[in-house]
């Protein structure tokens, strides 16, 4: 797309139409050209008070302009109030009094992310931006916006639209049967001429450049309904790698009427990588990525009904590719997909690639896949799917036919400890343990993966003071137990086999935490949250107790009710009841009392 540089348009003023202002952070900060300043709304008092309300800002251009797209920059700090999930943009054309129909957008939950909304309108004098106050699953109490920008496409855009007559539809992915090499000479834009020429010669590779995409239920709404962490916001990969600043032509064609916002998220999970979201609309989209990274379609509905499919063509997109069992990929298709990725990754340091099972969505480097799984990948996704299925069983989702279609995202990260960040589970510098079944089953690796997945699966009423690192461990402990007899498993169980020296003991013993709980509870008569506890080194006056010792009585109930098959639905019933009683006003004490009531009911 050489020679297709966009022009940033001048904005004369900004006016707050609906909403309020926090301190001196008014809307003028969104047109000062400084990403370090921002507009911020003031709180309405609670997340519930924010629900159904929006911030509306009206921008006036210096003169009427043809607008290609609008860019919204989210505030770059990590505060949850910096993140907005949805909204819309509408325009008022010069000489008109009626605003155009609003174009909706959804945004990545990432601080500092750019949100591009394709507008494609002529002679626009004013732009209104609406941002929803509430972000599902985040519980923010205000909205922040760092910068508003308007861009105009180059004149070449009209030449591209004129060339559509050579193609069968508006995706520009197939030529009409009457097209000849001679007639192609009428095409004025070099990139479209080259596209048509390669299509005519049978040389254009559409494997990942052209695909049909399906809608899915919003991962934030799934999380809110089940009172758990978000499912993958990158569950719909394109297999295309985008380079910062390099324009790409994206052709979009809906297969029916749709009112669901459609976006392209570009996420770079390499060290120091950034993320952005670009709103797409039917027809031609000329995009300029604000960052490099892999592309993902975000086409989210509010319920399970779904929306019409959409065909998308990324013209000459760089194909990293991906493997997805739901698309019909198997071990037979894996070598060709991996080889394509290796070729494309030659000039992309630490290029990342996605694999998707029925339950999980995993990302690692192309080099890691080539090293750890050069010939087959099915067993890799199967073992992670199996682990997650046991967590869903414990949550009551299997029994109640409520397992979400949305997948869970796990990523190879670049430093620190394994963690759950609200969007994905991060596993630093993890390759073999994620991608080699024999290593995955070694000692505590199932526990490590299940622990971070477990944080994302913690039911709201089953975590909090004292249980943040406990109820998620119940998931991974159960998964480790249920997978102990798998062919590659060493049979290792952390609670039963890991050595631990309880207070007062002369030496560490295997299963020492079980011994510690029995000694602290039955001999020393210490209360539950004081067992194997010490004063915090960084929180004066706060007692911290061993989370594995606190897990023991919960694990005993698992063994009695579920392993011994006394009440195999014990934990599913306890958690399912908790999911449907998510009163956020409950104190920690009330939550524990409610848990005991639910446990009594489930054990009856």
Spans of features found by a protein language model:
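Disordered, acidic Ser/Thr/Pro-rich linker "stalks" and the adjacent N-terminal cap
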Residues: 1-62, 75-82, 153-158
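Short beta-strands within extracellular/lumenal beta-sheet-rich domains
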Residues: 47-64, 114, 220-241
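Exposed low-complexity, polar/acidic, P/S/T/G-rich flexible segments that act as propeptides
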Residues: 67, 137-161, 302-350
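Beta-strand-enriched, solvent-exposed domains that form extended recognition/catalytic surfaces
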Residues: 159-327
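Catalytic cores of extracellular degradative/oxidative enzymes
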Residues: 340-559, 584, 588, 600
């Amino acid at each position: 797309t050489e020679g297709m540089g966009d022009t940033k348009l001048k904005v004369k003023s900004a006016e707050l139409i609906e909403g309020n202002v926090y301190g001196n952070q008014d809307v003028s900060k969104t047109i000062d050209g400084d990403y370090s300043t921002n507009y911020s709304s003031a709180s309405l008092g609670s997340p519930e008070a924010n629900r159904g309300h929006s911030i509306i800002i009206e921008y006036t251009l210096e003169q009427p302009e043809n607008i290609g797209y609008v860019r919204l920059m989210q505030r770059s700090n990590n505060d949850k109030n910096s993140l907005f999930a949805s909204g819309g943009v509408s325009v008022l054309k010069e000489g008109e009094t009626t605003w155009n129909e609003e174009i909706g957008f959804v945004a990545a939950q990432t601080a500092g992310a750019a949100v591009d909304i394709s507008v494609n309108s002529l002679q626009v004098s004013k732009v209104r931006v609406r941002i929803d106050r509430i972000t599902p699953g985040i519980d923010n109490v205000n909205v922040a916006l760092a910068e508003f920008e308007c861009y105009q496409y180059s004149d070449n855009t009209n030449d591209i639209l004129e060339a559509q007559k050579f193609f069968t539809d508006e995706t520009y992915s197939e030529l009409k049967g009457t097209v000849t090499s001679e007639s192609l000479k009428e095409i004025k834009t070099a990139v479209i001429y080259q596209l048509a020429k390669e299509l005519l010669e049978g040389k254009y590779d559409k494997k990942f450049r052209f695909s049909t995409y399906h809608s899915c239920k919003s991962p934030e709404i799934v999380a809110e309904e089940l009172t758990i962490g978000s499912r993958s916001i990158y569950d719909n990969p394109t297999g295309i790698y985008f380079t910062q600043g390099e324009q790409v032509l994206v052709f979009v064609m809906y297969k029916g009427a749709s009112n669901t916002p459609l976006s392209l998220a570009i996420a770079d999970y390499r060290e120091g990588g950034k993320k952005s979201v670009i709103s797409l609309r039917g027809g031609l989209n000329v995009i300029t990525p604000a960052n490099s990274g892999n592309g993902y379609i975000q086409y989210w509905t509010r319920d399970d009904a779904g929306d019409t499919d959409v065909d998308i063509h990324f013209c000459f997109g760089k194909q990293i590719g991906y493997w997805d069992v739901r698309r019909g990929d198997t071990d037979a298709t894996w070598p060709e997909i991996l080889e394509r990725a290796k070729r494309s990754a030659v000039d992309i340091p630490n290029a990342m690639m996605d694999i998707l099972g029925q339950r999980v969505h995993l990302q690692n480097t192309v080099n890691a896949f080539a090293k750890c799984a050069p010939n087959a990948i099915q067993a890799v996704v199967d073992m992670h799917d199996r682990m997650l299925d046991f967590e869903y069983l414990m949550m009551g989702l299997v029994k109640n036919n409520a397992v979400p279609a949305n997948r869970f995202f796990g990523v190879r990260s670049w430093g620190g400890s394994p963690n759950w960040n609200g969007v994905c589970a991060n596993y630093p510098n993890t390759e073999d343990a994620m991608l080699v079944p024999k290593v995955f089953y070694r000692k505590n690796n199932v526990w490590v993966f299940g622990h971070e997945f477990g944080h994302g699966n913690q039911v709201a009423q089953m975590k909090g003071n004292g249980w943040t690192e406990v109820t998620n461990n119940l998931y991974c402990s159960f998964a480790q137990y249920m997978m102990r007899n798998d062919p590659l498993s060493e049979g290792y169980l952390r609670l039963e086999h890991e050595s631990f020296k309880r207070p007062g003991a002369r030496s560490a013993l295997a299963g020492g935490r079980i011994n510690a709980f029995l000694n602290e509870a039955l001999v020393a008569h210490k209360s539950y949250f004081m067992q194997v506890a010490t004063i915090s080194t960084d929180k004066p006056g706060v007692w911290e107790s061993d989370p594995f010792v606190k897990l023991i009585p919960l694990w005993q109930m698992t063994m009695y009710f579920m392993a011994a098959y006394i009440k195999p639905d014990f934990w599913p019933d306890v958690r399912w009841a908790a999911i449907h009683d998510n009163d956020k006003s409950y104190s920690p004490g009330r939550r524990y009392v409610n848990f005991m009531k639910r446990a009594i009911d489930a054990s009856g």
